[in-house]
Structure formats: structure tokens, C-alpha cells
Amino acid sequence: MLVLCRSVSGKSLPENARIMGETDETDFSPLQIGQQYKVYGVMFYTSRIDFLVSPASGGPMWVSSNLFDVVDDEIPQGWGCVLTERSEGYADLSEAFGIHSICGYLELIRSYSHYVGILERDPEELKIFYSQ
């Protein structure tokens, strides 16, 4: 699955799709307009969908799908999904942020410590991430 970045500005997010304090001034750097990104995961909120992408200069980050156009819509072979409210660890994401489910490579959806590790830039977890 590939997406094309068409904006790095919070202005591109509809009001009802803004979460965690996002505003018009929110800057989604290190994304680059016109750059294609491989999608490593898809996260479903009530009001929006996020893609897990990895800009060359920033590492893995979840970003609203509102900032992208889908270039290749094929879901990668071997992906799975986790329903957050029913899964240990992931239930925290449901309660705290309203995340309903995550789809992605198996380590992402089967290991909450891996999910947290890539966001916290744990070297061992990043090694797994970049092997995808």
C-alpha cells in the first residue's frame, strides 16, 4: 500500500477529524509534499483513519489519511487486524484515544510492546519495523 503526501498542514484536517490538540498550525514534518510513503499500518478512530508511515528523516509516525492520496490500495499479504478494546495493552488505546482497531504487519497488531516501542524509538523494535 502506497500513499502520496499532499499536505503537511493541520489546515487540511476537517474540524471533526482533529485529535490530540491538532490545530490549523499543526505541522506534520518531516513529511514532504509530493513524496510517496509505504503504509505499514492503518489505525481506525471514530472520526478518522491514520496511516503508519516512515519519512526518511523522522522514523515511524501515525498521520491522518486526510493528508494523503492513495496511490496503491492493495493491502499487503500477511497483514492482520486487532480490535483494541478486546486486546490486552491495546485496550489502553481504545480508552485513552478512541482507537477502535489497527491493521498492519503481524508484529504491530500482536505485540503491544512493539507498537509502543516503535513510537518510542526503541532500537530493537525499530529493527523489526524496518524489516517489514
Model region roles, listed by residue range:
Residues G58-D69:
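A short macromolecule-binding patch
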Residues S9, M43-Y45:
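Short, charged beta-turn/beta-strand-edge "cap" motif at the junction between a beta-strand
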Residues G21-E22, T46, G59:
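Compositionally biased, intrinsically disordered low-complexity segments enriched in polar/Pro/Gly
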